[in-house]
Amino acid sequence: MDRPVTTLFMLMSVDGKISPGATDNLDVDKDFTDIDGLKEGLHQYYEIEQTTDLWSLNTGRVQAKLGVNEKSMPDKTPVSFVLIDNSHLNEHGIKYFCQLSKQFVLITTNSNHPAFKVNADNVKQWS
C-alpha cells in the first residue's frame, strides 16, 4: 500500500507568539478566542506551551504591546526571559521582567537603553 509522506509544520514568529500577520490588527490572545474554527483548538496551544522549555525568547515590541511598561509588578516565576529590544521598553518594563524572571537577558544595540539604569541580581551582562 502506498502511503503519502506528510510533515506537520507550525509557523510561529521569532518572538514565540502565534502570528496573525505583520500588523497589530489582530491579537492572538484576545481575538482568536472569538473566531470559530480557531477558538476550539486554541487551548491545545496553551497546554503545549506550558510543557516547553523554561526559557522564553520575545521582543520588547510585543511586551510593550502587552502593557508591561505600565503593569503592576508580577510574582517571580521559574521562567527565564531573553528580550530583544532597542526602544520599546521603558525602565518600568525592564524592572517588570527583572521581577518576573528567574534570569533576565536583554539584547540591545542601544547604548542608552533604560535597562542600563536598572540593577538586579538576576540580570546577565556581558561586555
Please identify what each model-predicted range represents.
Residues S101-S127:
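Histidine/lysine/aspartate-rich catalytic loop segments that bind and position anionic ligands
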Residues M1-L100:
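N-terminal nucleotide/polyanion-binding subdomain common to many enzyme families
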